Amino acid sequence: MANAPVGNIYTAALMQHNSHPDYKYEMEGCTCSHEGVNPSCGDELTLQLRIEDGVIEEASFVGSGCAVSQASADMMADLITGETVEEAKRLVGLFLGMIKGKALSEEDKEDLDEAAELESISRMPARVKCAELAWRTLEKLLADK
């Protein structure tokens, strides 16, 4: 995916996660939540987590925004569910580095799973904040965990 053309950000995975998100719902019994807003385009979301014994047992989000922000949030929630807080922080760092143009190893891309498909967005500055929204919200939410 590293050589994807700039115009090809709407991958099958992105469209699937946007059209049929598995993690877009209001969670009952969340242990923490945080709101994120992208003021430049109006994307907004509330990320909700249920953390037990240092493990993210459940992740969900609610909100509205463009296909990129919504798909990125769904991919992220899928990726971090079942992971430790520390691993989720590591994954956030990988994703935010990638979306800012940092080259990742194949192993790091595998760790990001479908979220690695958003790499081509790094070459579209106007869309970077859309892709980052959920991840930056997670970063802030986990900062004191």
In which residue ranges do the predicted regions lie?
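Domain-level signature for proteins that mediate thiol-based redox and metal-cofactor handling
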Residues: 1-145
